[in-house]
Regions:
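Short, Gly/Pro- and small/polar-rich lid/capping loops
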Residues: 1-21
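Short clusters of small/polar residues that mark proteolytic maturation junctions
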Residues: 8, 33-34, 122
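Metal- or metallocofactor-binding catalytic centers and their adjacent structured scaffolds
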Residues: 23-99
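Metal-dependent enolase-superfamily TIM-barrel catalytic cores that perform enediolate-based chemistry
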Residues: 114, 119-256, 260
C-alpha cells in the first residue's frame, strides 16, 4: 500500500478545525484532524509533509513520523506539531482499516467497558472563530440551542447542575476566572472579581451539594501568585481538578502550585511529544 494523495478540508462554519485525508492506491482513506491555526497548518501539510509522504507505506507509522520530524520547530506544539498530529491520526486510521479492526484493539484492546462522563460546559459558538482563544470568542449573547452551557454556568450554574444530574452526569467543567485573567494578564485578581468568579461554585454546591464534581479550567492564563490565591479560595468547594492553572514553561512552578492545591492537577493540554510528557511526569 502506498500514499497517493494528501487532502485537506476547512469549513467556513468551523474555521478553527482542519480535516486531513490520506488517500492510498488500495482505495483506503485515513482521516485525521487538528485544531487552531488551521490555515497555517494546512500550508505546512502541503508544502512540507505531502512531498515526504507521497509513494510511502502508510503502515510504517514510526518511519513516517521520523521523516516528518525536522531540525526546527518540532519541540513545541506549534504548526508543525499540530500538522504531524493530524497525519498521525490519519495513519493510524489507515492501519485500523487495513487490519480490519478498531485501532484500540490493535493496540492491545480495551481495559474497561464503560467510562464516566463529565460535561465541558461550552456552547455552540465556543471558539468557533479562528481569531483567538479568549472570552471574546466564546460566542455569548445569541444562544443557538437549548444546551448553551457556557452561558449557563456563568449565570445560572445551579440550574445547569440540576439539569446535568437529571441526565446522569455527575461532573462539570467550568472556567469563570478567565475574564479576570485577561484583564490583568494573569497577574492580579481583585477581591470583587474573585468573589464574582466564585459565585458559580456557590450556586452548584447550594443546588446539588456534593453530588456534582466540579472541574476548573484556567486555560494557562494565570501567573503563579494569583493562581495560588485562587486555589486557596476554591478549597471550600472541594473542586475535583484544576486544569492548566498556569503556563508550564517551567515545570518547577507547577510543583509550587501543587503546594496550595488540594484538587487533582491537570496540565498536559499544551504539552507535545513524549519528551514534554516525560519532563512533566518527573515533577512528581
Amino acid at each position: 500500500m502506498k500514499i497517493t494523495q494528501l487532502e485537506t478540508l476547512r469549513l467556513g462554519e468551523f474555521p478553527n478545525i482542519l480535516w486531513v485525508r490520506l488517500h492510498t492506491d488500495e482505495g483506503l482513506v485515513g482521516l485525521g484532524e487538528t485544531f487552531m491555526g488551521a490555515q497555517a497548518v494546512e500550508a505546512y501539510l502541503h508544502e512540507w509533509a505531502a512531498p515526504r509522504l507521497m509513494g510511502q507505506d502508510p503502515l510504517a507509522i514510526e518511519a513516517r513520523a521520523r521523516d516528518l520530524t525536522g531540525y526546527l520547530g518540532w519541540r513545541g506544539s506549534g504548526v508543525e506539531t499540530r500538522g504531524n498530529s493530524a497525519l498521525d491520526i490519519a495513519l493510524w486510521d489507515l492501519f485500523g482499516q487495513a487490519a480490519n479492526m478498531p485501532v484500540h484493539t490493535a493496540l492491545g484492546g480495551k481495559s474497561r467497558d464503560s467510562i464516566r462522563v463529565y460535561n465541558t460546559c461550552a456552547g455552540y459558538q465556543y471558539i468557533r472563530s479562528n481569531v483567538n482563544q479568549s472570552s471574546s470568542n466564546w460566542g455569548l449573547g445569541n444562544p443557538s440551542g437549548p444546551y448553551e452551557d457556557l452561558q449557563g454556568f456563568l449565570h445560572h450554574a445551579d440550574e445547569l447542575a440540576l439539569s446535568l444530574l437529571s441526565e446522569g452526569i455527575t461532573g462539570m467543567k467550568i472556567w469563570p476566572f478567565d475574564i479576570a485573567a485577561e484583564q490583568s494578564h494573569g497577574q492580579y485578581i481583585s477581591a470583587q472579581d474573585l468573589d464574582s468568579a466564585l459565585e458559580p461554585f456557590r450556586k452548584i454546591r447550594q443546588a446539588v451539594g456534593d453530588k456534582m464534581d466540579i472541574m476548573v479550567e484556567f486555560h494557562s492564563l494565570w501567573r503563579l501568585p494569583m493562581a495560588r490565591k485562587i486555589s486557596r479560595a476554591l478549597q471550600e468547594f472541594d473542586t475535583f481538578w484544576h486544569e492548566d492553572a498556569i503556563r508550564i514553561d517551567s515545570l518547577d512552578l507547577l510543583k509550587q502550585y501543587a503546594e496550595d492545591c488540594r484538587a487533582l492537577i491537570c496540565a498536559s493540554e499544551t504539552l507535545s511529544y513524549k519528551w514534554g510528557f516525560k519532563d512533566y511526569l518527573q515533577t512528581g
